């Protein structure tokens, strides 16, 4: 934010401003310069230079974007989003998935979300954001150790040039072909990054949902023992709210390394159903159908029909609305499932009111069933035997 605006505010409310400055200094919150230092992409190929303040102004106005300042070469390796092999037309691992699903539990999800949302904010360039990502890494490692999987399964920090790091857990398979489950761990108060941002739904809910799926999946001896055909990764991204910064950095690296990512599923906001119920509509999950991979999205609908007790609805969220966009830009098939149709999703996000009390853990459990089915079915799917098809976006 500009110092001139700060000084005006200070003249009006000196006590409040003094407290603001105290918090800024005590927690090392870093804001960007006043000059246009950030290159953002608001649509495919449409870019503009903005200041840090202008980034948040755009977000407050509902504009989503990718901050491509450090990732202008993302997608430059010549990868094309493709269906080089067809995704399964039906689910085949019902016995194994249903057995593992019995381990999914709302109690750990609630305990983990209470802890995650207790951080004053998880703003990616603050000490709070660093501490919250440290907690995520610690918790994931605890899950691995409790499962007795620490000889094969790993969790590592993916550092960035800002304070908060991303976290990647890897379950090796028989091949390097990889299935990725993602959520973003950061939160933001769009009025000012220093203000409280519990981020219970956005995206604390997705963070703990995939954490619980990870815990349940490690109950499988075959998975832990490396018998899945494909490698499985769980990603907790930093700095989604700043323009998909963390996920772009990761997929930029994967693209340069020519990693073979077969599918990426994003879980961003999995707990709010009040908007749907208030509209007298049935509880459902929202399957995003714009800027996603059509074949993978079709498969997700099949997974929901097989493993969830509620239906899906198609919905749209626009360009760069979550981290799946980074995978897509790198040339990898990606998809996104949200808590409801987009227009019925949580109105409390990016404020101090994004609280646990407004969320349904039973609904989050449905997202867990879907994610578990998705990752197990594709983890054990032999892509080498499927038929080549056409790309559709």
Curated annotation (Swiss-Prot):
User: For Zn(2+) 2, which residues are the binding ones?
Assistant: 202, 241, 350
Enumerate the glycosylated residues: 176
What's a Pfam family in this record? Answer: Peptidase_M28
Q: Where in the cell is it found?
A: Secreted
**Could you give a GO molecular-function term held by this entry?**
aminopeptidase activity
Q: Which UniProt keywords apply?
A: Aminopeptidase, Disulfide bond, Glycoprotein, Hydrolase, Metal-binding, Protease, Secreted, Signal, Zinc, Zymogen
Q: Which cofactor does it need?
A: Zn(2+)
Cystines in this chain: 317-321
The protein's Enzyme Commission number: 3.4.11.-
**Propeptide regions on this chain:** 19-84
Q: Which domain of life does this protein belong to?
A: Eukaryota
Q: Which GO terms describe its cellular component?
A: extracellular region
Principal subcellular localisation of the protein: secreted
Q: Where does Zn(2+) 1 bind?
A: 184, 202, 268
**Cofactor: record remark:** Binds 2 Zn(2+) ions per subunit.
Q: Where is the signal peptide?
A: 1-18
Q: A Gene Ontology biological process annotation? A: proteolysis
Write out the similarity annotation: Belongs to the peptidase M28 family. M28E subfamily.
List the PANTHER family: AMINOPEPTIDASE YDR415C-RELATED, METALLOPEPTIDASE M28 FAMILY MEMBER
Question: How is the quaternary structure described?
Answer: Monomer.
Q: Which purpose does this protein serve, as stated in its record? A: Extracellular aminopeptidase that allows assimilation of proteinaceous substrates.
What protein am I looking at?
Answer: Leucine aminopeptidase 1
- Per the UniProt record, the source organism is Metarhizium acridum (strain CQMa 102)
| Gene name of the encoded protein | LAP1
């Amino acid at each position: 934010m500009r110092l001139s605006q700060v000084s005006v505010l200070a003249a009006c409310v000196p006590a409040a401003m003094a407290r603001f400055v105290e918090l800024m200094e005590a927690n090392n919150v870093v804001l960007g310069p006043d000059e246009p230092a950030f290159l953002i992409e608001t649509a495919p190929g449409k870019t503009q230079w903005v200041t840090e303040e202008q980034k948040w102004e755009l977000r407050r106005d509902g504009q989503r974007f990718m901050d491509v300042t450090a990732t202008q070469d993302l997608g430059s390796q010549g990868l094309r989003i493709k269906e080089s092999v067809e995704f399964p037309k039906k689910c085949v691992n019902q016995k194994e998935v249903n057995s593992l699903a019995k381990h999914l539990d709302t109690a750990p999800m609630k305990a983990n979300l209470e802890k995650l949302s207790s951080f004053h904010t998880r703003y990616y360039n603050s000490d709070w954001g660093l501490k919250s990502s440290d907690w995520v890494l610690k918790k994931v490692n605890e899950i691995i150790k409790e499962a007795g999987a620490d000889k094969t399964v790993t969790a590592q920090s993916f550092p960035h040039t800002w304070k908060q790091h991303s976290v990647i857990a890897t379950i090796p398979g028989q091949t390097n072909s990889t299935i990725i489950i993602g959520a973003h761990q950061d939160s933001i108060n769009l009025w000012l990054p220093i203000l409280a941002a519990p981020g219970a739904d956005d995206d604390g809910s997705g963070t703990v949902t995939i954490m619980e799926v990870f815990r349940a999946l490690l109950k499988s001896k075959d998975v832990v023992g490396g018998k899945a055909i494909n490698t499985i990764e769980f990603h907790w991204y930093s700095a989604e709210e700043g323009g998909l910064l963390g996920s772009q950095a990761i997929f930029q690296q994967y693209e340069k390394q020519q990693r073979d990512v077969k599918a990426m599923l994003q879980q961003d906001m999995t707990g709010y159903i009040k908007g749907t119920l208030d509209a007298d509509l049935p509880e459902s999950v929202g399957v995003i159908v714009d800027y996603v991979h059509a074949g993978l999205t079709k498969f997700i609908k099949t997974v929901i029909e097989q493993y969830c007790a509620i239906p899906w609805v198609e919905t749209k969220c626009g360009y760069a609305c979550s981290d799946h966009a980074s995978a897509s830009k790198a040339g990898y098939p990606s998809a996104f499932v949200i808590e409801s149709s987009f227009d019925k999703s949580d109105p409390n996000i990016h404020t101090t009111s994004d609280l646990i009390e407004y969320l349904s853990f039973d609904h989050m459990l449905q997202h867990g069933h879907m994610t578990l089915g998705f990752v197990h079915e594709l983890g054990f799917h032999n892509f080498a035997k499927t038929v080549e098809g056409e790309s559709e976006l």
